Amino acid sequence: MSETMTNQNVVNEEQPFNESKHRSHGIDISAIERSMEDLSIDNETIALEVNKLKLFYGEKEALHGIDLSIPQKRVTAFIGPSGCGKSTLLRCFNRMNDLVDGCRIDGQILLEQEDIYRKGVDVAELRRRVGMVFQKPNPFPKTIYENVAYGLRIQGINKKRILDETVEWALKSAALWDEVKDRLNDSALGLSGGQQQRLVIARTVAVKPEVLLLDEPASALDPLSTLKIEELIHELKNDYTIVIVTHNMQQAARVSDYTAFMYMGDLIEFGSTNQLFTNPSCKQTEDYITGRYG
């Protein structure tokens, strides 16, 4: 799959890769090489399979025949310039694009070999299984406790013991419990931006999803809060498949196992983060990660 994918929807002009240029743009290639396993998509269990996916806004085609495999319990990063289709593709995975007037898709997205766009799919259940965290923290105007318990109550879970245990577990999973355990009845709106984002992650994992979609989850946060989110992503991938959209290539290099580079609605290149950042197959990829455009 990896070799086939890398050569689909690509510009085939290749040039020798100049590693020193990456260091000049702040990406420590040696650190990536030291930290990454020798990954291959061929050896992975696949969580999400994208087959010939096209997306249209009215008559405008925004995604052009995407083929992609998202490995289970790994972090996959989508990178590329603004408007390239990263977030559009991400929102396809839990059908958030259904909410956009005039939006339609051709092709398939398979979750556990089931097409999530087939007729009769329970979209609410799909969005439980494939949770999403947005760029700007969006806590509800409720207490910290009720923010996390909200999805459970929607599912009809109201037993206090179950709610208490799940809220504590979810807040611990989001590395927030120690900071809020003595003020669970305080408003979530009083938390810092970084705490609010981790609360949103806790709210998402409380309903036991299989996949977490993160759309620029740290772009509105300060460096310390960003570091906490990145550390949390490393922890969460032990239990969840994670797909993250980021404009920050250093962040993609730090947190992801696999990276997909997109440009103008096309998937240009996909591979292990190690391979893509140290030895990209396509000149377009090299140009982007070395800062020539984007």
Swiss-Prot record:
GO cellular component: plasma membrane
Record-level GO BP terms: phosphate ion transmembrane transport
Molecular functions (GO terms): ATP binding; ATP hydrolysis activity; ATPase-coupled phosphate ion transmembrane transporter activity
Enzyme class: translocase
Record region (Disordered): 1-24
PROSITE patterns to which the protein is assigned, alphabetical: ABC_TRANSPORTER_1, ABC_TRANSPORTER_2, PSTB
Catalytic activity: phosphate(out) + ATP + H2O = ADP + 2 phosphate(in) + H(+)
Stretches with biased composition (Polar residues): 1-18
Domain of life from the UniProt record: Bacteria
Residues that hold ATP according to the record: G80, P81, S82, G83, C84, G85, K86, S87
ABC transporter domain residues: 48-289
Cellular localization per UniProt: Cell inner membrane
The keyword Protein biosynthesis is assigned to this record: no
Keywords assigned by UniProt, alphabetized: ATP-binding, Cell inner membrane, Cell membrane, Membrane, Nucleotide-binding, Phosphate transport, Translocase, Transport
SUPFAM superfamilies: P-loop containing nucleoside triphosphate hydrolases
EC number of this enzyme: 7.3.2.1
Record's subunit section: The complex is composed of two ATP-binding proteins (PstB), two transmembrane proteins (PstC and PstA) and a solute-binding protein (PstS).
Family annotation (NCBIfam families): 3a0107s01c2
Function statement: Part of the ABC transporter complex PstSACB involved in phosphate import. Responsible for energy coupling to the transport system.
Family note: Belongs to the ABC transporter superfamily. Phosphate importer (TC 3.A.1.7) family.
Protein name per the record: Phosphate import ATP-binding protein PstB
Gene designation: pstB
